[in-house]
Amino acid sequence: NLFQFARMINKKLGAFXFXNYI
């Protein structure tokens, strides 16, 4: 469960960084 939460956070962070890059 914790691993899934970490994956969700990582995905959100990745999307945030991607949006910042664009």
Curated annotation (Swiss-Prot):
Tell me the tissue specificity.
Expressed by the venom gland.
Any one GO biological process: lipid catabolic process
- Cofactor notes: Binds 1 Ca(2+) ion.
Keyword Acyltransferase annotated:
no
Superkingdom to which the source organism belongs? Eukaryota
Cell compartment(s), UniProt = Secreted
Which cofactors does the annotated protein need, by name?
Ca(2+)
Q: Tell me which family the UniProt entry assigns to this protein.
A: Belongs to the phospholipase A2 family. Group II subfamily.
Q: Can you say what this protein is called?
A: Phospholipase A2
Please tell me the species this chain comes from: Daboia siamensis
